[in-house]
A protein has these predicted regions:
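Bacterial N-terminal signal peptides
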Residues: 4-17
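Sec/Tat signal peptide C-region and signal peptidase I cleavage site
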Residues: 18-22
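Non-transmembrane, aqueous-exposed alpha-helical and coiled segments at domain scale
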Residues: 24-71, 82-211
C-alpha cells in the first residue's frame, strides 16, 4: 500500500514539476438554487488511503455536483440526488455515511425508464458501481466498488413510479427502499410548448431561459 501511495505522489510531481496550480474560476450556473440545496457528506476510506484527503475529512457532494455531472438539472437528476440523500439518512441516521460501504439495487434493468441516468448520480455520491467499477486491492478486492450496483430485471417497480432503489449497508446489512414518483413534482403547463421550441433551436432567448 505504501508503494501505491509513493507511486501516486511520484506521478503527481512528474505532471506538476513546478508545484500545484489551482484551477481558476468557478462554474457559473443560471440557477442560484443549485448551490443552496443541502449537501451530502460522505466519508471515503479509499480517498484517505490513497492520499486524496486527510483522515477525518469528508467529501461534500452538492446538487451542483450532480448537475455538473449530468450536464443539466431535471426531475430525474433532482430525484436521484434527493432519493440518495433520504436513503443515506435512513441507513446512517446522524452518522456520516461511508462511501463504498453501500450496495445499490435498482428494480428493473438499466434501460428501464430513467434507471440509467439516475444510477449515475447515485454512483457519484455513494461510490457504488456496476461491473465497470474499481475492483479494489489484492485478491480480496479491498476498497472495491465493483458490482456494488446491480439492476434487477426480474422485478420491475410500480408502473407509475419513476424508479425504485434498494440501498443496503455492506457492514451490517441494514437496508431501505426508496421509490420516486416524478408525477408528484409540480409541472409547468408551459413545458409542452417550450420543449419542441428548445429542441428544434427555434426558441427565443427568453423562452430558453424560461425552459
Amino acid at each position: 500500500m505504501l508503494f501505491v501511495c509513493m507511486l501516486i505522489v511520484w506521478i503527481t510531481y512528474c505532471i506538476f514539476p513546478c508545484g500545484f496550480v489551482r484551477a481558476e474560476g468557478q462554474t457559473k450556473y443560471s440557477k442560484d438554487f443549485f448551490d443552496t440545496v443541502e449537501p451530502i457528506k460522505m466519508r471515503d476510506p479509499l480517498a484517505v488511503v490513497l492520499g486524496a484527503m486527510d483522515k477525518g475529512e469528508v467529501f461534500a457532494f452538492t446538487y451542483a455536483d450532480a448537475v455538473k455531472f449530468a450536464g443539466h438539472s431535471c426531475p430525474a437528476v433532482a430525484g436521484a440526488y434527493k432519493s440518495t440523500q433520504m436513503a443515506l439518512r435512513a441507513l446512517y441516521g446522524d452518522e456520516i455515511p461511508v462511501r463504498g460501504n453501500i450496495k445499490v439495487s435498482f428494480k428493473g434493468d438499466v434501460d428501464y425508464k430513467v434507471n440509467g441516468p439516475i444510477s449515475q448520480v447515485v454512483t457519484l455520491i455513494t461510490g457504488a458501481a456496476p461491473e465497470s467499477g474499481f475492483k479494489g486491492f489484492g485478491t480480496a478486492g479491498k476498497y472495491g466498488r465493483y458490482n456494488l450496483m446491480t439492476f434487477d430485471r426480474d422485478h420491475a417497480p410500480d408502473p407509475k413510479a419513476t424508479c425504485s432503489i434498494v440501498f443496503q449497508r455492506v457492514d451490517n446489512g441494514k437496508k431501505t427502499e426508496v421509490t420516486y414518483y416524478v408525477e408528484f413534482v409540480p409541472a409547468s403547463e408551459r413545458m409542452d410548448k417550450l420543449i419542441p421550441l428548445v429542441l428544434s433551436g427555434k426558441a427565443s432567448e427568453d423562452e430558453s431561459k424560461e425552459f
